[in-house]
């Protein structure tokens, strides 16, 4: 039976004019801002460098879509909000995307991209992480005095029978438990893990690898490791002490800690009774868990509010005022939570629906690489602007999703962007900044 697809649509009259619509406009794209993503990529040389080092098991005589094209097609698609491989069966003919990845013919289909993702392995994951660190080092003109490495894990909900799927009691769902490492807003690690392990599993090894490479580049640099109480494990603490790495890591409260902190807890309670306002009192105690090799300094934050007592503890090997260390250094790790939220919410890091383990690790890395492009666009192109602190989804909506008519011939490709775009001046500023240097 013949199925007819409607190509023209009628809408209610406006100002005595008939309104008609149809998908017959030719080369028109909603992704005119792809040029900014491409420019950020060229600035970093991200995909060009990765493509030179990533393995490609395909027969070179039969390759239609080069590895760098596949990488760009997937990353640029994620930046523009296309998380599903099926989207590329339509996008492969989009002139805007073709231009961004520097191809004139149809791009790879969803099945080609799927085969590519399922061919990923441990070596590919290692090379991407290595590329992140090398790029991070290369982007520093001068050696930094201090680097703060933030560790955190998050849940990646699962709805199928993926390899490594386990039920997690805390999150109350089947999920993966990826580990992220950030230095400021720069992503240095995105490591997929099953959820049937300790939240700190592999953290020590990853920190050791990062510290070793960073100190090769900058021997005098001071390195600080931050994490919540899930990462307070003797192996990590002992390694940091032995290698002159500073740390501020949350410590779960217990009866011994509460007993040691009792003077400050009572002081906060007394002050609250007198003022009826939230009180915080800070102190430092020496504490050693049974599994630790020695006692360590622990910051006590004795807080009392209208809801009662709320003591918190942070183990440190730094000197300084307890309140300053807690407020100015430890609490600053909360900004990392926003960066982690951007991974699934803005760049679809939770799209780990492949059956194979390494294919899902590869998807997590692709989202991380897309974040690297968006972070560069924000850090370089949007510094000091109204979008300087905007999340990836906001940047996409206001600067990347711009309607454009495309005219392509043998000499040039013209993007005729929407004249009514409200961010034209900002767009021009970003172009100039990404083109400089």
Can you name each region flagged by the protein language model?
Residues 40, 88, 325-362, 366-377:
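Short amphipathic alpha-helical "interface-anchor" segments enriched in bulky aromatics
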Residues 146-150, 222-224, 246-248:
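Structural preference for beta-strand elements that scaffold enzyme active sites
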Residues 1-173, 177-198, 202-217, 378, ...:
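Dynamic "connector" segments at or just before major functional cores
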Residues 71, 350-426:
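Basic, amphipathic alpha-helical segments enriched in Lys/Arg and hydrophobic/aromatic residues
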Residues 3-23, 246-348, 404, 430-437:
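An anionic, glycine-rich sequence signature occurring as long contiguous blocks
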